[in-house]
């Protein structure tokens, strides 16, 4: 049995397509999105609509409040529990989403062997506060391989890599290689030509704003959720917060959401290119009906192996 992971950049059309595919093969969707796990964050995370969720059951959506901690290790554990439930009911589980870290946790396993040390983390954060950029330089010196995989702006993962090195004397990149992978999955990546994808992103952002994204953010803030939460730094939310703070006008806010989403989509595509055996489909050139037929056959065939 091999389960499909259907990944790809934001706004490529994963949800709409896979709801139709899964509906026709008696499958259920396991969301692979690190933002759709949060309650109350519906518009800005482009969650499946109630109608789509009624047509095909979705798992790993609305499981946490915005201030709750979560990581890829917990995602793997919880999503595999959902898979067990789906299998018991005789259905096919299909992972759908664009969070590359979650895909890695499933396919490559995840290293979680060194407990967090808040004292070390506090020291590292303070060091970075006093000398911005110093942690990146330390990572490049102590673990060059990890530095090539961790984005320069990803302070959280940089601190984790340094924390592991400081506690064990070993590089996190080495420890991760010792983590066993999982051969129960195969990866399908949906993509589009850049002009097509960027146009879809721009139109999606316009729809989000029309649907009430600003009011959604206001409501979250009024519920007591801090702008400093990791969840509230999601693209779309952080720009609205800065707009509400008067840092720029409405038009600039919309422009920044579109630009930052386009940059994010580009990073997602780069991430999924790391999977050598992934099967790619370009939705700009393939008809929806033709692709639906191909995906249904591919998912069912691999699941039956």
UniProtKB/Swiss-Prot annotation:
UniProt cross-references to SUPFAM superfamilies, sorted A to Z: P-loop containing nucleoside triphosphate hydrolases
Region of interest called Interaction with substrate tRNA, as start-end residue ranges on this chain: 33-36
Record flagged with keyword Iron: no
Subunit structure: Monomer.
Purpose: Catalyzes the transfer of a dimethylallyl group onto the adenine at position 37 in tRNAs that read codons beginning with uridine, leading to the formation of N6-(dimethylallyl)adenosine (i(6)A).
PANTHER family tied to this protein: TRNA DIMETHYLALLYLTRANSFERASE
Name recorded for this polypeptide: tRNA dimethylallyltransferase
Protein's organism: Thermotoga neapolitana (strain ATCC 49049 / DSM 4359 / NBRC 107923 / NS-E)
Gene: miaA
């Amino acid at each position: 049995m091999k389960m499909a992971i259907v990944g790809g950049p934001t706004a490529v059309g994963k949800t709409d397509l896979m709801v139709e595919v899964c509906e026709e093969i008696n499958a259920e969707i396991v969301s692979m999105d690190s933002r759709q796990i949060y309650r109350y964050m519906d518009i800005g995370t482009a969650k499946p609509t109630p109608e789509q969720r009624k047509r095909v059951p979705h798992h790993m959506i609305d499981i946490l409040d915005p201030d709750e901690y979560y990581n890829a290790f917990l995602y793997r554990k919880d999503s595999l529990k959902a898979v067990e439930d789906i299998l018991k009911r005789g259905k096919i589980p299909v992972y759908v989403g664009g969070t590359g870290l979650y895909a890695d946790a499933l396919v490559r396993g995840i290293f979680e062997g060194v407990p967090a040390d808040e004292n070390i983390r506090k020291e590292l954060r303070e060091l970075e506060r006093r000398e911005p950029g110093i942690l990146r330089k330390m990572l490049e010196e102590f673990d060059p391989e990890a530095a090539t995989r961790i984005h320069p702006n990803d302070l959280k993962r940089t601190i984790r890599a340094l924390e592991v090195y400081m506690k064990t004397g070993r590089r996190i990149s080495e420890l991760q290689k010792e983590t066993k992978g999982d051969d129960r999955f195969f990866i399908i990546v949906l993509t589009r030509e850049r002009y097509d994808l960027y146009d879809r992103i721009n139109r999606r952002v316009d729809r989000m704003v029309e649907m009430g994204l600003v009011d959604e953010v206001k409501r979250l803030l009024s519920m007591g959720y801090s702008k400093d939460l990791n969840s509230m730094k999601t693209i779309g939310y952080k720009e609205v917060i800065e707009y509400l703070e008067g840092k720029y006008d409405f038009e600039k806010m919309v422009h920044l959401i579109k630009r930052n989403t386009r940059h994010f989509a580009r990073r997602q595509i780069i991430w999924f290119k790391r999977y050598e055996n992934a099967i790619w489909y370009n939705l700009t050139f393939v008809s929806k009906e033709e692709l639906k037929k191909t995906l249904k056959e591919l998912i069912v065939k691999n699941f039956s192996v």
